[in-house]
Amino acid sequence: VGDIERIPTHIAGLDENMQGGIPQGHICIVAGQSGAMKSSVTFSLLYNAVLYGETSGIYVTLEQGKDSLRSHMSNMGMNVDDPRVRNRIAIIDLSDLRVQLDEQGMSNRIDWMGQLIKQLTSYRQSIGFELLVFDSLGAFFTLTKMENPRDEIFRLFEACRRLELTSFFICEMTGEDHKQFGEYGVEDYLSDGVMHLTMERTGDDITRKLGVIKMRHTHHRLGYSPILWSAEDQRFTIS
């Protein structure tokens, strides 16, 4: 296990309890309820991996527009126009593509997953990116109305493995008691890693916590730790 190349999360307190980071090429899901900061935490993984490492990545968004995402992350101190990261992080808004296809009357006839995989393959070959964030799986299936989401998730994860991407897929917690990672019941066992963000209420206070539920080829600490953002250090910290 010691010889595996790893990508540090740059979440203070996490890497030291996870053998230095996430194994390269892993497919991880980042799950949590609405408001648990899934997008912010996952964007910080990408941003700091690019800022401190020799890598590049793509953030695929469907949840919020490109400008809104840039502005939100910039307010947190993660400026995508910073010269150190500017040419190494691409933000792709898939809802733009949906609008174009709707206008052409094509959105119902298209193999969405095939198109997405084709686009990722093309970017991988042209700009050589290594990290992928997908925000979010649920929004993608709502947008595309695919008939067999479980099969399509398998197809997407396999494509990411083939392209040797280290990938983070954002998912909502679902099920009657909100204990299911993702909406289709297969995301957690098809993935290599599961990071779970929770919100715990005590009186009027809410504490966000992070737990690493699963990380293949990695000795990691189980249990949940409070997670806080430090604007000064531009990183999350767990305590």
Stretches found by the model and what they are:
Residues 55-138:
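Conserved inter-motif catalytic segment of the P-loop NTP-binding fold
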Residues 7-11, 15, 24, 63-70, ...:
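Amphipathic alpha-helical transducer elements in NTP-driven molecular machines
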Residues 28, 58-60, 90-92, 168, ...:
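Hydrophobic/aromatic beta-strand patches that form the interior of the parallel beta-sheet core
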Residues 28, 107-189:
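P-loop NTPase motor core
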Residues 1-76:
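The Walker A/P-loop phosphate-binding site
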Residues 167-232:
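Phosphate-binding/switch region of NTP-binding enzymes
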Residues 1-11, 109, 116, 122-123, ...:
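NTP-binding/hydrolysis catalytic cores, primarily Walker-type P-loop NTPases
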Residues 20-23, 48-53, 81-85, 122-126, ...:
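Conserved catalytic network of the ASCE P-loop NTPase/AAA+ motor domain
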